[in-house]
Amino acid sequence: MNIEVMSRQMAKRYAYKPHSEKTLVISITDPGSELNYLEGNKDNGIRKIVRMQFEDTDNPNTSISPAQAKEITEQVAQFTEHMDKIIVHCEAGQSRSAGVAAAILKFYTNDDTQIFDNPRYTPNMYVYRMVLEAFHNM
C-alpha cells in the first residue's frame, strides 16, 4: 500500500504539480482553519479529498470523533482499490496524519512500522486507536 504522510504545506505543493498516480487525500486541519485550499484535478492526480477538522489532542471532546474516524475508514475502503496512493496530511505532518496513516497500514497490511519506526513521526495514539477501531467496526 502506497501511503504518504505530509504537512499542509507539502500537500499544497503536491497539488500544484502534475502526478500520474490516482490519489486519495485525507486532509486534516485545525478547527476554524481554511478547508478548501486543495483541489483535485486530472493533472495532479487527486481524485478525492476527505476534509475534516479536529485538534491534535487525546481529548475526546476536541480530537477526532467516532463519526470522523468512520468517514475516514469508509472513504479508504471505497477508494483503495481504485487509487494508486493515499496521502494523509495535517498541519505539521507528524501527529494526526501519522496516526491515521498508521491505522490504515495496520488494518490493510498488519504492519504500521513504516510510521512507528520513523523518528519523523509521533503518531497521535488517540487518533490511531479511533481509526483502527472504526476499521474493525466496519
Regions found by a protein language model. Name each.
Residues A69, T73, A98-A101, Y128:
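Short amphipathic alpha-helical surface patches that serve as generic macromolecular interface elements
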Residues D30-S33, E55-T57, G93-S95:
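Short, solvent-exposed loop/turn segments at secondary-structure junctions
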Residues V50-I87:
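Helix-loop module immediately N-terminal to the HCX5R catalytic loop
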